[in-house]
């Protein structure tokens, strides 16, 4: 149960919980949402690299190189790198006086 809805008090030398409205639908919904949030947070921290890489690049994975000779693969890599290098020339350095 949620710490916000329960009060723990010592009862007969043991810790017990006095909450009469634990069957309230709002309390149940809040507990479920809290548990789901905790699970998602833990998964996010464990797999954040995979998750954010997926969202950044999506399902795009470049063309398949299966059955392509290594020389053609290298040529394709060079073309792609040259295209990236050419894009760098579009940036203009502005100096303020």
Swiss-Prot record:
All ranges on the Virion surface side of the membrane: 1-22
Site (Seems to be involved in pH gating): 41
Principal subcellular localization: virion
Residues with Phosphoserine modification: 64, 93
Free-text function comment from the UniProt entry: Forms a proton-selective ion channel that is necessary for the efficient release of the viral genome during virus entry. After attaching to the cell surface, the virion enters the cell by endocytosis. Acidification of the endosome triggers M2 ion channel activity.
Oligomer status and interactors: Homotetramer; composed of two disulfide-linked dimers held together by non-covalent interactions. May interact with matrix protein 1.
Note: When the channel is activated, one or more imidazole moieties of His-37 probably become bi-protonated.
Protein name: Matrix protein 2
